[in-house]
Structure formats: C-alpha cells, structure tokens
Swiss-Prot record:
InterPro entries: UPF0328
Source lineage: Eukaryota, Fungi, Fungi incertae sedis, Microsporidia, Unikaryonidae
Domain of life, source organism: Eukaryota
UniProt organism field: Encephalitozoon cuniculi (strain GB-M1)
Residue segments, region Disordered: 1-24
Name assigned to this protein: UPF0328 protein ECU01_0090/ECU01_1520/ECU02_1550/ECU08_0020
Length: 276
C-alpha cells in the first residue's frame, strides 16, 4: 500500500506543479523592443528642444522624426494586443460577452488605424507656431504612447479574466500615467501649451520607471477572474484611451479638411490648439 500511495501522490503532484508553475510572459508585454515606448517619447521631445521652431516646415524630415516613433509604436502595439489571445475567438461565449469582446477588438484595430492616419495628418500640416510644435512634439507622443503602454503592460484582455493586473508600486505609476493623460487633454482645451513639455517629460520618467519595474518583476501567472475593482480600473483606462484616440481622429479629419477642399470639414484654420 505504501508504494501505491507514493505512486498516487506522484501522479497527482505533477498536474499541480504544472498548474502552479508560472506561465510564459504574455506576448503583449514583450512584443516590441523594450525601449520602444521610451524612445517614442524621447525622440519627439528632443525635436522640440534642439531645432529652431521655424526649421520644421523647411525640413519635413524633422517632422517625421517627431511624429513617426509614437505613431509607429501605437500602430504596432494594438494589433499585437488583438493577436495576443488567439484562443478568444475559439471559445464559445454568451451573445452579450461575444459582442463586448468584438467591440474591444474593433476598438484596438481602430486605435491602430488612427495612429497610422496621424502620421499623414501631422506631417502634412504646417508647424507654423510654437503652439503647434508643442502639440505635435510633446503632447501628441504622450497621448499616443501612454494608452498603448497601459493596455499592454497593466491590463489583461483575455476573455474571462479581463481587467487591471498591476499591484503595489505599479498601481501608483499607472495612476500617475492616467492623471497625465487627463491633464494633457485638459491643458490642451485650455490652450496651456507651455505646460506640454512637462507632461511629456513626466511621461518619459513614468514609462522608464514602468519598464524597469517590469524587467525586474516575476512573469504573470495564468489569468484568473478579476475582482470588480480591477475590472473598473480597466474600464477607466480603456474609456480614457477611447476618448484620447477619437480626439486625435477628430483633429486628423480637421487637418485633412484644410488641405483637401473636397473633404468635409468646418475647421476655420490650421491652428491645432483651437481644435481639440
């Protein structure tokens, strides 16, 4: 009986160890170069301080350096979030849940499309004032990078366990990132463009802190159903991300309306700070 008991305990212990073993890191945490979100903010802010403001319209390459990194990071990251959970489409779900996840997937792809559209819009518009330069090279990178970074590193999008996943110090970093997004949108409405570089530099520090925390932390285990407060935190982050990206889309449409007479638009001018 002793041998049988040992064999039984060995057979039952193996699945338990497999369940308790940490899973591989989610593919959405390490999809792009780990420094990509950091450089996506750092390069544009360098473009704000190094060249003379009037050189941007003379040299479109400077515009591209400021606009391309954050737009490219956002455009790549959201499809990776969409593809990061292939089993979600194979699991049968109630109609309401299936509709919600369909809207979630459609929103991620829409965010990516808006990021690509922003490359064309913000590089073709004239950077003819300090306000426009501040919006494009300091505020816009923060608005593009922070939502993508939060949804990639702080949230689980797996059906059945969707929610906010961070803990301890990471929660404080995430809260500060959300506050920066809200502050950036508010300052833009108030046309307080002189504060945009502070928003950008603060975003740079927080992204670097988050990257250092993630690189030294343990991999996340298999997802489990999230408590209500974590779902509410995810809804807050995702809702703010939707507001940010559709505000950027609105601005892109206004820019295209100024450049193409056939494009429907009611924009009176090309001053970015008067449109968001």
């Amino acid at each position: 009986m002793g041998i049988i008991d040992v064999q039984r305990s060995h057979l039952t212990a193996t699945p338990s160890k497999e369940r308790d073993a940490p899973a591989h890191p989610p593919p959405t945490i390490l999809p792009v170069c780990i420094l990509f979100p950091y450089t996506s903010i750092a390069l544009p802010v360098l473009m704000y301080y190094i060249p003379e403001k009037g050189q941007f319209d003379q040299n479109p390459f400077l515009k591209l350096i400021a606009i391309l990194p954050p737009c490219l990071y956002s455009a790549v990251q959201f499809p990776l979030l969409f593809l990061g959970n292939p089993e979600s489409s194979c699991t049968p779900r109630p109609a309401l849940y299936a509709t919600l996840y369909l809207l979630l997937d459609a929103s991620l792809l829409a965010f990516s499309a808006i990021s690509i559209l922003s490359i064309a819009a913000f590089t073709t518009t004239e950077w003819n004032s300090d306000e426009v330069v501040a919006v494009c090279s300091t505020l816009l990178p923060s608005l593009l990078v922070l939502p993508a970074h939060l949804l990639s590193t702080s949230c689980a999008l797996t059906p059945g366990s969707i929610g906010f996943t961070d803990s301890s110090v990471d929660i404080l970093i995430d809260l500060l990132m959300v506050s920066l997004l809200a502050a950036g949108l508010t300052l833009n409405v108030d046309e307080s463009w002189r504060f945009f570089p502070y928003i950008c530099i603060s975003s740079l520090v927080l992204v670097l802190a988050k990257l250092l925390r993630k690189s030294s932390s343990m991999p996340r285990r298999d997802p489990a159903p999230a408590p209500a407060w974590r779902i509410a935190a995810f809804v807050l982050i995702f809702g703010l991300s939707m507001f940010v990206y559709f505000s950027i889309l609105y601005e892109c449409l206004l820019i295209f309306g100024n450049h193409f007479p056939w494009f429907p638009s009611q924009a009176p001018s090309n001053d970015l700070t008067n449109k968001w």
